[in-house]
Curated annotation (Swiss-Prot):
Transmembrane segments: none annotated. This is Transcription factor FapR. It comes from the Bacteria. InterPro entries: HotDog_dom_sf, Thioestr_dom, Transcription_factor_FapR, WH-like_DNA-bd_sf. The keyword Transcription applies. Pfam families: 4HBT. One of its GO terms (biological process) is negative regulation of DNA-templated transcription. Belongs to the FapR family. SUPFAM superfamilies: Thioesterase/thiol ester dehydrase-isomerase. Transcriptional factor involved in regulation of membrane lipid biosynthesis by repressing genes involved in fatty acid and phospholipid metabolism.
Amino acid sequence: MRVPKKERQRLLQETIEHNPFIKDEELSKQFSVSIQTIRLDRMELKIPEVRERIKHVASEHLDEVKSLSMSEVIGDMIDLKLDDSAISVLDIEKEHVFSRNEIARGHVLFAQANSLAVALINDELALTTKADIRFSRQVHLGERVVAKARVMKLRGDGRTDVTVESYVGEECVFDGDFTIYRRGEEEQA
């Protein structure tokens, strides 16, 4: 059954408000219309393309990263609350995959998660001392990986326990428990 244009546009706007990272291709499948129709609807509704939406969300939700430069974070960081939680988005492109099967290289998913765990630390020196990681399924060319990190415990020994879960859509594709060393204020003097 075809949904009338006004109703589709209302639902499109709600969907994008709920998930600003959704791609036009996914929206076209969800609403059973062409990608061009989705783009025209977005233009009429003055909704920017996904990359602009990601930048907008990021500009509103970022503390200043202390432990890394932003160029060292793998993926686009869109949310950061130091010593609490962080989110990054990585679109899997040709340079991230094996050429023969278009499956993402494991070290790319690890690098996204590890750099997010380190960036989360509210200290100028933060280093990974331990990582226990699990890959749940293959990630393919063109998929979007959303990594979510949260601090589980600030220990008294200068270490912080961080958990990172990475998703494609609603499906968890990677998770890891990281122990991050932080220098601490007393050692900076």
